[in-house]
Amino acid sequence: MHDIKSIRDNPQAFDAGLARRGLKPLSASLLAIDERRRAAILASEQAQARRNAASKEIGDAKKAKDEARAATLMAEVAELKTTMPQLEAAAKAADEELTKELSAIPNIPFDEVPDGVDEHGNVQHHVFGNKRNYGFAPKLHDDLGNALGYMDFEAAAKLSGARFVVLKKGLARLERAIGQFMLDLHTTEHGYTEINPPLLVRNEVMFGTGQLPKFEDDQFWAIKGELLASPDHERLKTERLGLIPTAEVSLTNLARESILDEKQLPMRLTALTPCFRAEAGAAGRDTRGMIRQHQFTKVELVSITTPEASKDELERMLSCAEQVLQKLDLHYRVMTLCAGDMGFSSQKTYDIEVWMPGQGDGGMFREISSCSVCGDFQARRMDARSRGPDGKPRFVHTLNGSGTAVGRALIAVMETYQQEDGSIAVPSVLQPYMGGLKVISRD
């Protein structure tokens, strides 16, 4: 969330940042609400101060036996007791209005972020590896999985509907191996601490990382059975729990409502979890295969750090995610996202796009990881702070990245390591996790 003081100090810069996001200027309307809020707070504080002073003056008047003065002051205090709740309510309402408006506005991109309105404005940063040459036409992962008999979308549809999959035997084992390999890499070589977090979280936790209020329709929600028949819609919204769309939500919020010792920073956390996304805006897109699922597995990387270190931490996080694909010997490219294509909470984002030879007409790059620095944007929403060099609390900076999406890594491995007979060669780095198995083939 944005700092209203920063907007007050430089409204032109704020509006310029919003323009790069494709948004209209908002500083004037925000500052008008802020002015009302400050005036209401001042009026409430002045009324409280006057009530305190008048109460003291009543005692002085009574000591001086000035009953008329005391009666006048008592009447004033009685009137203030009536008006003060109204003033406090007005101040609270203005504060809530400002918070509501600020909470729906995305983060401001760094100056170095390229301009652009969508993915067409993204800029290639660098490329790793090369496309492989096959002596046959590479197949899509779902064709490979169906032929093996280990990828069943029909069974999943019977259980849960569209955008789910049942993996079996060698492919189920391969997906598990990929996730374990990623976790081991990040914890043993990259210095991340493994966390096993809750998958169901409160509204305020979703708010903290920016899923609420703007992206409510993209989430899956769980409610207690006793609430199903409740006519109280507000109670439903208050008591519901959200299924995490990414472990970023749980991991980042571990710092919420805390003042950390900066000696503890950077705090680097990782988790392998199922993730759940309603994909409300994805109707008709990627309907085939495992590319876009309602439920998928992902290894998440989160860093909590100081303002001075956050930019360097982004480069480090990107490198950690890249090493997953390098060790799997997968061809990929890194893209710097343009301002119009970045996520809501991000100041700068790198996307890693892995080459999938079975996709499209002759193969295509598909996103497998996003690494973002968010500055203090999420920290303000969570009230996550650290004690700085001067001993005063200040907001931490947060970063998050996929390290990486396990399902998409499975797809990339299947399509990259497919053999002409439809079997899948197991990358050497994964073979220890597969009991030494070198090839996945049909029983």
Curated annotation (Swiss-Prot):
It comes from the Bacteria. Keywords: Aminoacyl-tRNA synthetase, ATP-binding, Cytoplasm, Ligase, Nucleotide-binding, Protein biosynthesis. Pathway: Aminoacyl-tRNA biosynthesis; selenocysteinyl-tRNA(Sec) biosynthesis; L-seryl-tRNA(Sec) from L-serine and tRNA(Sec): step 1/1. Its EC number is 6.1.1.11. It is found in: Cytoplasm. Pfam families: Seryl_tRNA_N, tRNA-synt_2b. GO terms for cellular component: cytoplasm. Its main location: cytoplasm. GO terms for biological process: selenocysteine biosynthetic process; seryl-tRNA aminoacylation. L-serine binds at T246, A247, E248, E300, S402. It catalyses: tRNA(Ser) + L-serine + ATP = L-seryl-tRNA(Ser) + AMP + diphosphate + H(+); tRNA(Sec) + L-serine + ATP = L-seryl-tRNA(Sec) + AMP + diphosphate + H(+). HAMAP family: Ser_tRNA_synth_type1. Consists of two distinct domains, a catalytic core and a N-terminal extension that is involved in tRNA binding. Catalyzes the attachment of serine to tRNA(Ser). Is also able to aminoacylate tRNA(Sec) with serine, to form the misacylated tRNA L-seryl-tRNA(Sec), which will be further converted into selenocysteinyl-tRNA(Sec). Belongs to the class-II aminoacyl-tRNA synthetase family. Type-1 seryl-tRNA synthetase subfamily. This is Serine--tRNA ligase.
